[in-house]
């Protein structure tokens, strides 16, 4: 109202000047306080009035009390695994554990007290035929097939033919170390046979079964195989008995021959000619490591043959050679 009276007192010219003054002030404050209010004067004239700028903010009020906790949110995804931290300090030593059970005897103890032959196993009460561990003179353990049933038992089997599943036409190295399977046919190895028969006097038994189920055998007073330096020479005692007859004495003192080492007395290689490995002379009366030909065969003397038994044209179903310390 006071402003209106001032404007009337100034007259039209004063009102115009007052209006221009306010316009100038409004332009200067446009950047900070741009709001302009237009008010009416008497008559049709109007006057624009600039609203003042807001004052400075007052001081902050006291902090209000904390609101109630909101509901717990869902668990977030696992973060990336961090690096392993440094090792912690070494813990205290734990208490001493309970004493363990007594273990199996060591090899040295087993060698000192273990069996040397299948016959020794038999005297210790092992009456079942099968594979057993014995210890050679150099303390080497050897798994062997023990025949505890035939002719009083206690025989160590070193050769077995039974089904033709194993190839016996092999080289010197194979016969040296042995080959075959515990489940069927095998040759124990000339080194092992030498070690077994070097312990003392051993008798030899040869058991044969034909494909008609007929059993034959031949038994010798002594049997030994020399070492490799003597080419595994056959050292054989006299023939004792047996319905198979004697077809091994003609091989006495002969060296062992294979397809790759010819040590026989023949101009050719008996091992190659008769497809085997044996103590060939020139050439053989027996060939138990020959081809597995399943009974009668038209080829000559190249099967599992025993001349004084079924002759040179019959290959036995089963052949076993075994020794027993006397």
Swiss-Prot record:
<keyword id="KW-1015">Disulfide bond</keyword>
<protein>
    <recommendedName>
        <fullName>Ficolin-1</fullName>
    </recommendedName>
</protein>
<dbReference type="GO" id="GO:0030246">
    <property type="term" value="F:carbohydrate binding"/>
</dbReference>
<feature type="domain" description="Fibrinogen C-terminal">
    <location>
        <begin position="109"/>
        <end position="326"/>
    </location>
</feature>
<feature type="signal peptide">
    <location>
        <begin position="1"/>
        <end position="29"/>
    </location>
</feature>
<comment type="function">
    <text>Extracellular lectin functioning as a pattern-recognition receptor in innate immunity. Binds the sugar moieties of pathogen-associated molecular patterns (PAMPs) displayed on microbes and activates the lectin pathway of the complement system. May also activate monocytes through a G protein-coupled receptor, FFAR2, inducing the secretion of interleukin-8/IL-8. Binds preferentially to 9-O-acetylated 2-6-linked sialic acid derivatives and to various glycans containing sialic acid engaged in a 2-3 linkage.</text>
</comment>
<dbReference type="InterPro" id="IPR050373">
    <property type="entry name" value="Fibrinogen_C-term_domain"/>
</dbReference>
<keyword id="KW-0479">Metal-binding</keyword>
<dbReference type="GO" id="GO:0003823">
    <property type="term" value="F:antigen binding"/>
</dbReference>
<keyword id="KW-0399">Innate immunity</keyword>
<feature type="compositionally biased region" description="Low complexity">
    <location>
        <begin position="61"/>
        <end position="71"/>
    </location>
</feature>
<feature type="binding site">
    <location>
        <position position="264"/>
    </location>
    <ligand>
        <name>Ca(2+)</name>
    </ligand>
</feature>
<keyword id="KW-0176">Collagen</keyword>
<feature type="site" description="Mediates specificity for sialic acids">
    <location>
        <position position="312"/>
    </location>
</feature>
<feature type="compositionally biased region" description="Basic and acidic residues">
    <location>
        <begin position="90"/>
        <end position="104"/>
    </location>
</feature>
<dbReference type="GO" id="GO:0001867">
    <property type="term" value="P:complement activation, lectin pathway"/>
</dbReference>
<keyword id="KW-0472">Membrane</keyword>
<dbReference type="GO" id="GO:0005581">
    <property type="term" value="C:collagen trimer"/>
</dbReference>
<dbReference type="GO" id="GO:0005102">
    <property type="term" value="F:signaling receptor binding"/>
</dbReference>
<feature type="region of interest" description="A domain; contributes to trimerization">
    <location>
        <begin position="115"/>
        <end position="154"/>
    </location>
</feature>
<dbReference type="GO" id="GO:0005615">
    <property type="term" value="C:extracellular space"/>
</dbReference>
<feature type="site" description="Mediates specificity for sialic acids">
    <location>
        <position position="300"/>
    </location>
</feature>
<feature type="region of interest" description="Disordered">
    <location>
        <begin position="61"/>
        <end position="110"/>
    </location>
</feature>
<feature type="region of interest" description="B domain; contributes to trimerization">
    <location>
        <begin position="155"/>
        <end position="243"/>
    </location>
</feature>
<feature type="binding site">
    <location>
        <begin position="282"/>
        <end position="284"/>
    </location>
    <ligand>
        <name>a carbohydrate</name>
    </ligand>
</feature>
<comment type="subunit">
    <text>Homotrimer. Interacts with elastin/ELN. Interacts (via Fibrinogen C-terminal domain) with FFAR2. Interacts with CRP; may regulate monocyte activation by FCN1.</text>
</comment>
<dbReference type="InterPro" id="IPR036056">
    <property type="entry name" value="Fibrinogen-like_C"/>
</dbReference>
<dbReference type="GO" id="GO:0097367">
    <property type="term" value="F:carbohydrate derivative binding"/>
</dbReference>
<keyword id="KW-0430">Lectin</keyword>
<dbReference type="InterPro" id="IPR020837">
    <property type="entry name" value="Fibrinogen_CS"/>
</dbReference>
<dbReference type="InterPro" id="IPR014716">
    <property type="entry name" value="Fibrinogen_a/b/g_C_1"/>
</dbReference>
<keyword id="KW-0391">Immunity</keyword>
<dbReference type="Pfam" id="PF00147">
    <property type="entry name" value="Fibrinogen_C"/>
</dbReference>
<dbReference type="InterPro" id="IPR002181">
    <property type="entry name" value="Fibrinogen_a/b/g_C_dom"/>
</dbReference>
<comment type="similarity">
    <text>Belongs to the ficolin lectin family.</text>
</comment>
<feature type="region of interest" description="P domain">
    <location>
        <begin position="317"/>
        <end position="326"/>
    </location>
</feature>
<feature type="domain" description="Collagen-like">
    <location>
        <begin position="55"/>
        <end position="93"/>
    </location>
</feature>
<feature type="disulfide bond">
    <location>
        <begin position="270"/>
        <end position="283"/>
    </location>
</feature>
<keyword id="KW-0677">Repeat</keyword>
<dbReference type="GO" id="GO:0062023">
    <property type="term" value="C:collagen-containing extracellular matrix"/>
</dbReference>
<keyword id="KW-0732">Signal</keyword>
<feature type="glycosylation site" description="N-linked (GlcNAc...) asparagine">
    <location>
        <position position="265"/>
    </location>
</feature>
């Amino acid at each position: 109202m006071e402003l209106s009276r001032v404007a009337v007192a100034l007259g039209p010219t004063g009102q115009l000047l007052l209006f221009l003054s306010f316009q100038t002030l409004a332009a200067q404050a446009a950047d900070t306080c741009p709001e302009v209010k237009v008010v009416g004067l008497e008559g049709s004239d109007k006057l624009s009035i600039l609203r003042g700028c807001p004052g400075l903010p007052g001081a902050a009020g006291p902090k209000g009390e904390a609101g109630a906790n909101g509901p717990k949110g869902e668990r977030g995804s696992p973060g990336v695994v961090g690096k392993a931290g440094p090792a912690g300090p070494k813990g205290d030593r734990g208490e001493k554990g309970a004493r363990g059970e007594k273990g199996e005897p060591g090899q040295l103890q087993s060698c000192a007290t273990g069996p040397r032959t299948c016959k020794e196993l038999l005297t210790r009460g092992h009456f079942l035929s099968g594979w057993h561990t014995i210890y050679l003179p150099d303390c080497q353990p050897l798994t062997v097939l023990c025949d505890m049933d035939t002719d009083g038992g206690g025989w160590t089997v070193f050769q077995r033919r039974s089904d033709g599943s194993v190839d016996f036409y092999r080289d010197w190295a194979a016969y040296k170390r042995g080959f075959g399977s515990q489940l069927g046919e095998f040759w124990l190895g000339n080194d092992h046979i030498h070690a077994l028969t070097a312990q003392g006097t051993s008798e030899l038994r040869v058991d044969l079964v034909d494909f008609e189920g007929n059993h034959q055998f031949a038994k010798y007073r002594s049997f030994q195989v020399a070492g490799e330096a003597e080419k595994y020479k056959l050292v054989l005692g006299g023939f004792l008995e047996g319905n198979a007859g004697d077809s091994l004495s003609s091989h006495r003192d002969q060296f062992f021959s294979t397809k790759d080492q010819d040590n026989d007395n023949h101009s050719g290689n008996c091992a190659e000619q008769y497809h085997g490995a044996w103590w060939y002379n020139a050439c053989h009366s027996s060939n138990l490591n020959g081809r597995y030909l399943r009974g009668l065969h038209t080829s000559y003397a190249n099967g599992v043959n025993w001349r004084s038994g079924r002759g040179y044209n019959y290959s036995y179903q089963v052949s076993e050679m075994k020794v027993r310390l006397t």
